[in-house]
Amino acid sequence: MSKINHQPSEAELEILQILWDDQPLTVREIHEIISQTKNVGYTTVLKQMQRMEAEKGLLIRYKEGKVHYYSAAIQKSDVQTSSLNRFVNAVFNGSTSDLIMHALGNQTTSKEELEELEKWLKEQKGKL
């Protein structure tokens, strides 16, 4: 797992999610996808992506002819792990069990989900 040096903002995560689903893409393609759900200008998306590439190292850009393509420079799983660790540390004082119990206590958990969780716990115990 690589170390995430910059925790992506909500807007950056939106762009990364699009790229993780289908990359490489151009700014225009990403703008078209984002524009389906919110009113944002092309130049806003362009500037955001330029900063993500040049300043934050979140994107990789390459040129093919006159077209610039972008790909995510970080793995989705690395961002998920980093974000979850920060959340658990900040909100649950580092306690993963508190997080899980809180999540299960606030949701309607199906029998299948509980069985999956039991299976996962047994696998984790076997790794100790």
Regions found by a protein language model. Give the residues of each.
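Short acidic, hydrophobic short linear motifs in intrinsically disordered regions
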Residues: 25-33
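Amphipathic alpha-helical dimerization/coiled-coil segments
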Residues: 82-125
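Beta-hairpin "wing" of winged helix-turn-helix
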Residues: 54-64
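Short helix-capping/hinge SLiMs at alpha-helix to coil transitions
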Residues: 18-23, 36
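Short helix-coil junctions and helix-kink-helix linkers
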Residues: 32-40
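Short, hydrophobic-biased segments on the C-terminal half of alpha helices
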Residues: 46-50
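Short alpha-helical segments that sit at the start of domains
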Residues: 1-16, 78, 127
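Short, cationic-aromatic polyanion-contact patches
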Residues: 5-9, 63-82
